[in-house]
């Protein structure tokens, strides 16, 4: 099939398609670089909460990863890891969240500048086991997590 551009042929759709393709191709390297950058999860505010929706048949795996997370935080030689552990609570809701179990991380106070990304903490603490642990962690999720940054409004105990 041969296309010609002329006043009657109207080649504007072709130029639009070409521009779209070039735009996608030119942005692909930038996206790949952004994805390759290490992930970190910081809580810049007073505290945070993370809602985790876990598959019913994967709760034991998730809880096993949480035990490894605690072990990794406690055995770290970095003082901020012990501070993180002191303010990090993991709750399990007795009610289902739809078809899934709900686990809630409550982080208060948040350690300013500390990385709360579980994959980074596990990789740091267990470099040879990290892939297997993190595969269990990833497979346990029914859907992504909801992350909420929090500012303390009032401490009712003080």
Residue positions per predicted region:
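N-terminal secretory signal peptides that target proteins for export/translocation
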Residues: 1-11
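Bacterial N-terminal signal peptides
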Residues: 12-27
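Signal peptide processing junction and immediate N-terminal pro/mature segment
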Residues: 28-34
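An amphipathic, aromatic/His-enriched active-site/gating alpha helix that lines ligand/cofactor pockets
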Residues: 34, 68-86, 99-100, 107-158
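N-terminal secretory signal peptides
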Residues: 34-87, 91-93
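Short, surface-exposed coil-to-beta transition loops
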Residues: 47, 100-102
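Divalent cation-coordinating acidic motifs and surrounding scaffolds
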Residues: 96
């Amino acid at each position: 099939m041969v296309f010609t551009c002329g006043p009657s042929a109207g080649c504007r759709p072709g130029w639009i398609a070409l521009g779209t393709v070039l735009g996608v191709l030119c942005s692909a390297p930038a996206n790949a670089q952004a994805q390759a950058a290490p992930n970190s999860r910081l809580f810049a505010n007073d505290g945070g909460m993370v809602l985790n929706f876990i598959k019913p048949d994967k709760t034991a795996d998730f809880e096993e990863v949480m035990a490894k997370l605690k072990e990794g935080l406690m055995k770290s030689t970095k003082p901020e890891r012990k501070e993180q552990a002191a303010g990090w609570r993991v709750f399990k809701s007795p009610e289902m969240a739809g078809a899934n179990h709900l686990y809630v991380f409550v982080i208060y106070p948040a350690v300013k500048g500390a990385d709360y990304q579980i994959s980074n903490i596990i990789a740091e603490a267990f470099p040879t086991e990290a892939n297997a642990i993190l595969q269990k962690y990833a497979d346990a999720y029914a859907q992504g997590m909801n992350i909420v940054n929090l500012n303390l409004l009032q401490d009712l105990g003080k």
